[in-house]
C-alpha cells in the first residue's frame, strides 16, 4: 500500500473529531432511480466550507457520527451512507448554498412517513456547524411511493361520491370557531349547506372542549347536513374533526362518524402526527370516508426562509401519508403565499407527474405513478370578490373555503352561502365562454348579483 493510500485509508479511523467531507461529500456520485433525493438550503457557520456543511447534513441524517467507531467495520458504509453529491450557491445570498443529498432506499421503513422524516430531518437541524438549515424539496422514488396507500380516495373518487363535476367545490369554516353550543353550531352548518355550499368545516382547534363535546357536535352536524340534503337534493358534507389526544380516541370518533353515515372526517395532521394520520387514512379508505386535512402548525415549520422545511415537502408527505383535501394557501387572501410557488406544490398534490421547475420551487421531477391526487383547499381571508381570481388560479380541482366570507354576510349565513355559490357558478360559466376572469372578474360578479 502506498503512503498516500495508507494515509487516506487511516483518516476515518483516527481518534477525535473527523471531517465529514472525507466520507460523505462525493461530487462524482451518480444518483440512482431508487435514491431519495433531498435539496437542503444550508447556511454554514463562519469558517465552515459549504462542502463540509453539506457532508455533515448527509452524515447526520444517515449513518454518520462525530468520530470513527469500530462498528463501522461490521457493515457496508458505502451501501448505507447518505451522500452530498452537489452544492450550488443561492443567488443573492452570499452565505447560503443548496446541498443535494442522496439517500439509499434501504435506510427507510416501507410505508412510514414518520421514519422518513426521523431520518432526514430528525437530527441534522441542531448541528453546530450550521447556522441554519432548510429542507426545500424531496424526490420520492416510485419504488418507495408504491409502499404507501396515499389518499383514502383521491380526486376522481370524491367527485363520483359527491356527484359534482366541472367546478371547484365550496366550503365554509364555522365561526366563531370556539364558544358555540353544539346545537347552535349545527344550526350554522345547516344554514350554510342549505344556501348552496358543498361542505362546512370544524376549525382546527375544535376537538372536544367543555362548551361543545365532540359527540354532541357530530350528532347536530349530521342532522344539519341530512336536512340540507333533503331540501337541496345535493350531497353535503361537514368536516368532523376527529383529532384527539390519543390515536384510540381519534379512531373512536372516526368510527362514530361512519356510523352516522356522514361522508367526510377531518384531521390536523401535523399536530396529530404522521403515524396517527396514516392510521386514520387507512381506516377512511376501508370504510368509505373522505379525509380532510388541516395543516395547523405548518408556519412554525415552513415560514422562515432559511430554516425549517418548505411546505412543498409537507405536501408531498401528506400525499404519501393520506388525505383527500389539504389547506394549501390562497395567493389572494390574508395568509402568506407566492403564486408560482403555491401553484408548484398544488401541482405536486394533484398531478401524477411533475417536471422539475426551479421557477416554481420544484427541485426534482416527481413521478407519483398511481398514487391518488389531493384536492388543494384555498382558505383564509377570502371573500366573494376573490372568486374570479381563485377560479382562474386553482381551476376546477380545488375546494374554495370562505369562513368570514360566508358568515359575515349582512343578511346572514344562508344568504352568504348563496352569494358564494352564485358567484362561483357565474365565474365558471364566464370562463367556459372564454371571458377573461382577470380583467372582467368584478363585472362578472356584478352581473350575477
From Swiss-Prot:
EC number(s) on file: 4.1.1.39
Cellular component aspect of the GO annotation: chloroplast
Modified positions (N6-carboxylysine) in chain numbering: 201
Site (Transition state stabilizer): 334
Catalytic activity: 2 (2R)-3-phosphoglycerate + 2 H(+) = D-ribulose 1,5-bisphosphate + CO2 + H2O; D-ribulose 1,5-bisphosphate + O2 = 2-phosphoglycolate + (2R)-3-phosphoglycerate + 2 H(+)
An example Gene Ontology molecular-function term: magnesium ion binding
Uppermost EC category: lyase
Cofactor descriptive note: Binds 1 Mg(2+) ion per subunit.
Chloroplast listed as a keyword: yes
Modified residues (N-acetylproline): 3
Catalytic site: 175, 294
PTM text: The disulfide bond which can form in the large chain dimeric partners within the hexadecamer appears to be associated with oxidative stress and protein turnover.
Propeptide feature ranges: 1-2
Domain of life: Eukaryota
GO BP annotations, alphabetical order: photorespiration; reductive pentose-phosphate cycle
UniProt cofactor(s): Mg(2+)
Identification of the protein by name: Ribulose bisphosphate carboxylase large chain
Species for this entry: Hippocratea richardiana
Organism ancestry: Eukaryota, Viridiplantae, Streptophyta, Embryophyta, Tracheophyta
Gene name tied to this protein: rbcL
Amino acid at each position: 500500500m502506498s503512503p498516500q493510500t495508507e494515509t487516506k485509508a487511516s483518516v476515518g479511523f483516527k481518534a477525535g473529531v473527523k471531517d465529514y467531507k472525507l466520507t460523505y461529500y462525493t461530487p462524482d456520485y451518480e444518483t440512482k432511480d431508487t435514491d431519495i433525493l433531498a435539496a437542503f438550503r444550508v447556511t454554514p457557520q463562519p469558517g465552515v466550507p459549504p462542502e463540509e456543511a453539506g457532508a455533515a447534513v448527509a452524515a447526520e441524517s444517515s449513518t454518520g457520527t462525530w468520530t470513527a467507531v469500530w462498528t463501522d467495520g461490521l457493515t457496508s458504509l458505502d451501501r448505507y451512507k447518505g451522500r452530498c453529491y452537489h452544492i450550488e450557491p443561492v443567488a443573492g445570498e452570499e452565505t447560503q448554498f443548496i446541498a443535494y443529498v442522496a439517500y439509499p432506499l434501504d435506510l427507510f421503513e416501507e410505508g412510514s412517513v414518520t421514519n422518513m422524516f426521523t431520518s432526514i430531518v430528525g437530527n441534522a437541524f441542531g448541528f453546530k456547524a450550521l447556522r441554519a438549515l432548510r429542507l426545500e424539496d424531496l424526490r420520492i422514488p416510485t419504488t418507495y411511493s408504491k409502499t404507501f396507500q396515499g389518499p383514502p380516495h383521491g380526486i376522481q373518487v370524491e367527485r363520483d361520491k359527491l356527484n359534482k363535476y366541472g367546478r371547484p367545490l365550496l366550503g365554509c369554516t364555522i365561526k366563531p370557531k370556539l364558544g358555540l353550543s353544539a346545537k347552535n353550531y349545527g344550526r350554522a352548518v345547516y344554514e350554510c349547506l342549505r344556501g348552496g355550499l358543498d361542505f362546512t368545516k370544524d376549525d382546527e382547534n375544535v376537538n372536544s372542549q367543555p362548551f361543545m363535546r365532540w359527540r354532541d357536535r357530530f350528532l347536530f352536524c349530521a342532522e344539519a347536513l341530512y336536512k340540507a340534503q333533503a331540501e337541496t337534493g345535493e350531497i353535503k358534507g361537514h368536516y368532523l374533526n376527529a383529532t384527539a389526544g390519543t390515536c384510540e380516541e381519534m379512531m373512536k370518533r372516526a368510527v362514530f362518524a361512519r356510523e352516522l353515515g356522514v361522508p367526510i372526517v377531518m384531521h390536523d395532521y401535523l399536530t396529530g402526527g404522521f403515524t396517527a394520520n396514516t392510521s386514520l387514512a387507512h381506516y377512511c379508505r376501508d370504510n368509505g370516508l373522505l379525509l380532510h386535512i388541516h395543516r395547523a402548525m405548518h408556519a412554525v415549520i415552513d415560514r422562515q426562509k432559511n430554516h425549517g422545511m418548505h411546505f412543498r415537502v409537507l405536501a408531498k408527505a401528506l400525499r404519501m401519508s393520506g388525505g383527500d383535501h389539504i389547506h394549501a394557501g390562497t395567493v389572494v387572501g390574508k395568509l402568506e403565499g407566492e403564486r408560482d410557488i403555491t401553484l408548484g406544490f398544488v401541482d405536486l398534490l394533484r398531478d401524477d407527474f411533475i417536471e422539475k421547475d426551479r421557477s416554481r420551487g420544484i427541485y426534482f421531477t416527481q413521478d407519483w405513478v398511481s398514487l391518488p391526487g389531493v384536492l388543494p383547499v384555498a382558505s383564509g381571508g377570502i371573500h366573494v370578490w376573490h372568486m374570479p381570481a381563485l377560479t382562474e388560479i386553482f381551476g376546477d380541482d380545488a375546494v374554495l373555503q370562505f369562513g368570514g366570507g360566508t358568515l359575515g354576510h349582512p343578511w346572514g349565513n344562508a344568504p352568504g352561502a348563496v352569494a358564494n355559490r352564485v358567484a362561483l357558478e357565474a365565474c365558471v360559466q364566464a370562463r367556459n365562454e372564454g371571458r377573461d376572469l382577470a380583467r372582467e372578474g368584478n363585472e362578472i360578479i356584478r352581473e350575477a348579483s
